[in-house]
């Protein structure tokens, strides 16, 4: 804004009366006598003194009278506060058109549409402005006589130094000038000011703050320490549902962000599924919730859909507004009671929903100890030549069988008789269904059925029913009332989504019932949910093997359904372990969490670098899409400083598009970085521990925590390091093994591709995870064996030389059964 320039005119100045000029008027005494005494104060000191000449004045007479000066001073403004940056207002130009163009044909003034023009005006091909005319227009528009009438005239005022050729451009002409100005001012006054955190380290990953990636933000904590935004987000994700904040590794205090806007931002990312591990360009479409291979529309194209966590369903809207959305990790929240709402009407479902909790009676609940007739593991003691006691564990080989093999009974009948018996049992099943369920023979052939719960909103569940899938319909059948609750044509299914580990979400084409939830018992077989998902998605499927028709035999044992089928319960409940079945094929390999350790300090230079890159590429080729890889590099830190330091990246899957860039930037440093191989190995293990703790957010859920085989692979350019006689190395080794549950192995880099390929294949066969032994009444020692495959044997030394008991406890997680097994075995005495 600028002060308008007025046309020069004669200035009339008022001159106060003078005593010499107006002697006939009243003297000054009368003038002063009429004023208040508070206006003028007498100054006796000056009255007594005669004004001396300049030559005889002493220096002391120039001392000012402070009291007199302060009494005559006005209000003093506050001094400027220069502690904060001063942002002057933008120099916006007030725009208006010419005076002539401001009047219409009727003589009326046109109204000014906007007092400030922040849009870029086209100044090309405009003649130079006449300065005299512009000044005249400004003086007219701002004059007192025309202020009210001409204040809205649209005048275009151009600066005289504006270049007509268009090379010059004013910043305030940008349409985003006000937005960017507000953002810049906020940035100067906020926590995200462009600071330089020199010498500070992240309180989580202990990397220097200067080692951040492009676009990384820094979080200042209440404990006066700093951390990377993504590092804090990963730990915050693990503790959010517990109502806790991370603890600072430096001072041990609870670390909360100083900026109050950071916590709501992180909570928003967690609730929308955009956590720390989803940021950046590493998003892999194959790892999303929806299986894109089978989530096609009926036209064969990929449908455009809203992420499940952001869907607004009709059941979420009530007279109270929106309900709390049910998230994929909703089992972390308390159940909230809402007003009972009726289940949506026909044509599919015609019964009111009940809210009975999904709970089996005591005799129906699965007990791992009772369910396993014989242990899959064999344990025994032995002694070495030095009289040291060893304990050995071996898991039995897996017995493979085809789909007909599970039908074999004790008489071992031939395949022809098996086929005949299967046809007979299938016929009885069809007769039972036709008599009790499909009386009009409209549903088609039977595919499978199980005892499941269903819901239309994911909150209120209907129990005591069978979900039966036919070739034409999905039928909801109440086996207590022996009546059909609802039927859904198979061509009405649009998408089938894995909502969480226990729930399937079926999106329908109907506007009456847009979706339906199917809930599985948490103790059911691992393959039950993928099997139902596969069968619902493949509309052309018409039959399954007899052993796959029903899986929830335990839940249906108290109902007369199994007996009416005419088949022995143990035969019907026998589940095939054939990995060729479609819903088992993708889950045959154990997912891995693999940490690969690389030493960049070597004398061979570029030759050694090529060997390292070749080994890493071989590992990437051998990993599956659901495996997670982390790389630890020693010889420099995260900012590139060469020294006895280490840095890491991960855990990320093999399809991350940043692996190529990361590997291309690896450079070999001088060979004298570490004193010896033990120091190098110690730094390697310490960096691995930092990576393991940073990626621990993946282990928050039990299904995920026990679903990975964890392995640390140290690629040595020379001999393998011995840690038995170094206590510091052994302590770091035990921390990774017992606390973070990682197995550690050292291998020399070889040019043979088969070596690494075979190593990864062995890791993918680890079925029994987190195997742990305890010796009750003998010692409090706990022996950790790690992950084991079927047929694998491991032996460990125990400290107790004379065990006092023949009993030993073994605990492990069976990946195939998705159950944690805890057993007490009797071991033969030595």
From Swiss-Prot:
A zinc finger (RING-type) spans 202-252. Residues 1-31 are annotated as: Disordered. Changing residue 87 to P: In FAR1-22P; induces cell cycle arrest in the absence of alpha-factor. Disruption phenotype: Some mutants appear to be defective in mating because they are unable to locate the mating partner. This is Cyclin-dependent kinase inhibitor FAR1. The gene is FAR1. Present with 238 molecules/cell in log phase SD medium. Changing residue 306 to A: Abolishes G1 arrest function. Associates with the CDC28-CLN complex. Residues 8-27 have a biased composition (Basic and acidic residues). The lineage of its organism: Eukaryota, Fungi, Dikarya, Ascomycota, Saccharomycotina. It comes from Saccharomyces cerevisiae (strain ATCC 204508 / S288c) (Baker's yeast). GO terms for cellular component: Cdc24p-Far1p-Gbetagamma complex; cell cortex; cytoplasm; mating projection tip; nucleus.
